[in-house]
Design a protein with these regions (language model features):
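Metal-dependent polysaccharide deacetylase catalytic core of the NodB/CE4 family, i.e.
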Residues: 33-36, 55-151, 180-183
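C-terminal active-site subregion of NodB/CE4 polysaccharide deacetylases
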Residues: 1-39, 44-49, 115-230
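Short active-site loop/helix that positions an aromatic residue
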Residues: 49, 53-55
Length: 230
C-alpha cells in the first residue's frame, strides 16, 4: 500500500471524527470507540518514511515484526519472487522506536501458529519476543498472530511467554476463542477503495467480514511456501 493511500486513510478517519491513539504503552481498556489504533504487520523497509511521518502527526504506530526476516527479503511471501521486499533492519527498528513507534512480535518464521504445539510453538512466541527486546532495549508484550490464526492453546502459550495481548482479525473469532486476550482489527488492503474503507469503518457488516476472511484464506499460498522453506 502506497504512503499516500495510508495518509488518505488517516484523513478519512479524521473526517469521520475519529482520533488516533498515542502513547508508549498500549492499554486497550483506555482506548475509546472513537479512537483508532494504527498497526502494521510485517514491518517492511519501505514503511519507514511513512511510520516516521505518522509519529510526527502525533500518531503511535504499532509494527509487528517476524524476527527471522529482520533486515532480510520477504521469502515467506509466495509473491516475493515477483514483488520482492525487504523488512526493517535492527538499526531501523531502533530509530523508529526512538521516534515513538511500538514494536511487537509477529512470530519468528511468520508461519501460522494454529497448527503448532510444544517446543516449536514456544520458539515462535518466546524467541521472537526475546530477540526483539534485545534489539530495541524495551519490553515487547504484544503479538500479532500470523494470518490472524490461533487456538486456545496458542493463547495460553502466548500468555505464559509474557504477552499481555494478541491481535488477530475477525471480531467473531476473537470473541469466541480469545477470552479478552485476543483483540480484533479492521484489515485494510491495497485493493480497498474509498467506499469499501468507509463501509469497513462505519458499518463493518457481513460482506466486509466475508471479504476479510476470503483474503485471509488466500494467504494459503504464503503458508504453503513457508512450509517448504521450513
Amino acid at each position: 500500500m502506497k504512503p499516500r493511500t495510508v495518509l488518505g486513510i488517516m484523513d478519512l478517519l479524521r473526517d469521520l471524527g475519529i482520533s488516533f491513539w498515542r502513547g508508549d504503552h498500549f492499554e486497550p481498556d483506555r482506548v475509546t470507540k472513537r479512537t483508532a489504533v494504527i498497526t502494521f504487520d510485517d514491518g517492511y523497509q519501505d514503511n519507514y518514511p511513512l511510520l516516521a511521518r505518522l509519529c510526527s502527526q502525533h500518531i503511535t504506530p504499532i509494527v509487528f515484526m517476524p524476527t527471522a526476516y529482520v533486515g532480510r527479503q520477504n521469502a515467506w511471501e509466495y509473491s516475493s519472487r515477483v514483488f520482492p521486499a525487504r523488512h526493517l533492519s535492527a538499526d531501523e527498528m531502533k530509530r523508529l522506536v526512538d521516534l515513538g513507534v511500538i514494536i511487537g512480535s509477529h512470530g519468528v518464521s511468520h508461519m501460522s501458529l494454529d497448527g503448532m504445539t510444544g517446543v516449536r510453538l514456544r520458539r515462535e512466541l518466546h524467541d521472537s519476543k526475546a530477540e526483539l527486546e534485545q534489539i530495541i532495549g524495551r519490553t515487547v508484550d504484544l503479538i500479532s498472530y500470523p494470518f490472524g490464526r490461533f487456538t486456545p492453546a496458542v493463547n495460553e502459550a502466548a500468555q505464559s511467554c509474557g504477552y499481555r495481548h494478541a491481535l488477530a482479525l475477525d471480531p467473531e473469532e476473537c470473541r469466541a476463542g480469545g477470552g479478552g486476550f485476543v483483540l480484533p482489527r479492521i484489515p485494510i488492503y491495497a485493493a480497498d477503495g474509498y467506499f469499501s474503507l468507509k463501509a469497513k469503518l462505519t458499518h463493518p457488516g457481513r460482506i466486509e467480514r466475508l471479504k476479510g476472511r476470503i483474503i485471509g484464506r488466500l494467504a494459503g499460498g504464503s503458508i504453503i511456501r513457508l512450509r517448504a522453506l521450513n
